[in-house]
Amino acid sequence: MMENYKHTTVLLDEAVNGLNIRPDGTYIDGTFGRGGHSRLILSQLGEEGRLLAIDRDPQAIAVAKTIDDPRFSIIHGPFSALGEYVAERDLIGKIDGILLDLGVSSPQLDDAERGFSFMRDGPLDMRMDPTRGQSAAEWLQTAEEADIAWVLKTYGEERFAKRIARAIVERNREQPMTRTKELAEVVAAATPVKDKFKHPATRTFQAVRIWVNSELEEIEQALKSSLNVLAPGGRLSIISFHSLEDRIVKRFMRENSRGPQVPAGLPMTEEQLKKLGGRQLRALGKLMPGEEEVAENPRARSSVLRIAERTNA
């Protein structure tokens, strides 16, 4: 049961400090989870402050609904739609900070019934919102071998992607897989060289989860929307847990922290340069967890926090 989980929020203070909270500000926690970041943000807001939280996991929504605070509201949906949520509330350009804690949460991993983990046998599901879309089992049973291989290679950086994809398709022809343990066993058997520090199914489970939940597309859309909804001086505080996520965040902040790229020697008037606009973000750097936090919470090891500020451009 979800109430039994003790969830340790990674980079809790650092991520919230990165928002540079104003007591009367309006903030978004795009990944409510079990509410660690939201509760800390609320503790720093005054009576006029406001926090809008988002999550697509029904279990997270159930936890959020226990917060009885007039400054707080929760939306059940993907954070990629934050632009729509903000527009509906007439808050475009008025958001003082957005926090995103990307990837799968510890409660999701630890609950066998959610199907995210190869360490616990459960239904082969992996959906952040189990009420929407295809489960991992449904997708693996209907996808072409080449498509599965592409997903494993692209989202899991799995070097044995083709071999594993073939084994998955062959197994599903014999008897459709419906359990996480079955997929983990098929992947392990199809992996010719084992990494002694990592379970052979690690990359496959990551890849399938990312694909089923459109995770990278969700991140890209949310980042794009953030430029429209943030007020000048508003902050982005984003925690990523693997290189694919961090690459997207790093590239977005870098590209939007530069001014317009005009080829050298190209004649342009001041009016034309104004239309191109200036830089929209100021990157404020990155933070990683210290040794003490990693010792207390090993899952924090790969996390990276990146912070940026919306400019007046």
UniProtKB/Swiss-Prot annotation:
Binding site for S-adenosyl-L-methionine: G35, G36, H37, D55, F79, D101, Q108
InterPro entries attached to this UniProt entry: RsmH (IPR002903), SAM-dep_MeTrfase_MraW_recog (IPR023397), SAM-dependent_MTases_sf (IPR029063)
GO CC annotation terms, alphabetical: cytoplasm
Catalytic reaction(s) noted: cytidine(1402) in 16S rRNA + S-adenosyl-L-methionine = N(4)-methylcytidine(1402) in 16S rRNA + S-adenosyl-L-homocysteine + H(+)
Keyword Signal: no
Compartment(s) of residence: Cytoplasm
GO annotation, biological process: rRNA base methylation
EC code(s) of this entry: 2.1.1.199
One Pfam match: Methyltransf_5
Superkingdom in the source lineage: Bacteria
SUPFAM superfamilies: Putative methyltransferase TM0872, insert domain, S-adenosyl-L-methionine-dependent methyltransferases
Keywords: Cytoplasm, Methyltransferase, rRNA processing, S-adenosyl-L-methionine, Transferase
Cited function: Specifically methylates the N4 position of cytidine in position 1402 (C1402) of 16S rRNA.
Family classification: Belongs to the methyltransferase superfamily. RsmH family.
Protein name in the entry: Ribosomal RNA small subunit methyltransferase H
Organism of provenance: Escherichia coli O81 (strain ED1a)
Lineage of producing organism: Bacteria, Pseudomonadati, Pseudomonadota, Gammaproteobacteria, Enterobacterales
Gene: rsmH
